[in-house]
């Protein structure tokens, strides 16, 4: 499974 | 973090502070759409639930806390503290037309079918259209105070700067998040008309007013 994108943005 | 992302965050923060100060100093929320502010409070609440599950950085956490707290402060000022000055008669956009479709879309198009991920996606979609009640109010009254125009410009340019940030990240980090990019494009497009008026009128010292 693809990782969901890292939520490092606001 | 690249320069576009940083400037985007700063302009977002500036927008929030400009609005808070405008209302607090003038003791009035005339010309401000309470509905848009309510939508932004929902946006921040549903997006930053990861405050409880993930720690990314001190910067990240503090900005999120400031965004959430200030959005609630703004809503409180409009609907409680300075309620008498709130121009509800002109704030007539039907927010269910924004909330329902974005909620449905977030169930259909998301990265992962989990509660946190769906709420995050919902917040991205809702943010892209949350300014519509405010823009509707400006078009209905045909004018906006200059300080409100500065607020709208700072808020609009923030997502535009994020678009450049995403181009940068795709180029140098091979990172991209299609949901955020498409929503960010929609969000930016909604401001284009306003950007034009801002540059041609407000920056030349005139008040923003629309032809009757």
Curated annotation (Swiss-Prot), chain B:
An annotated GO BP: protein retention in ER lumen
UniProt topology in membrane: Multi-pass membrane protein
Protein's name according to its UniProt entry: ER lumen protein-retaining receptor 1-B
Annotated function: Receptor for the C-terminal sequence motif K-D-E-L that is present on endoplasmic reticulum resident proteins and that mediates their recycling from the Golgi back to the endoplasmic reticulum.
Family of this protein: Belongs to the ERD2 family.
Keyword Transmembrane on entry: yes
Site (described: Important for recycling of cargo proteins with the sequence motif K-D-E-L from the Golgi to the endoplasmic reticulum): 193
One Pfam family of this chain: ER_lumen_recept
Stretches the record annotates as Important for recycling of cargo proteins with the sequence motif K-D-E-L from the Golgi to the endoplasmic reticulum: 204-207
A GO term for molecular function: KDEL sequence binding
Annotated positions for site Interaction with the K-D-E-L motif on target proteins: 5, 117
Transmembrane segments: 5-24, 33-52, 59-79, 93-110, 117-135, 150-168, 179-199
PANTHER family: ER LUMEN PROTEIN RETAINING RECEPTOR
Record's keyword annotation contains Glycosyltransferase: no
Subcellular location: Golgi apparatus membrane; Cytoplasmic vesicle, COPI-coated vesicle membrane; Endoplasmic reticulum membrane; Endoplasmic reticulum-Golgi intermediate compartment membrane
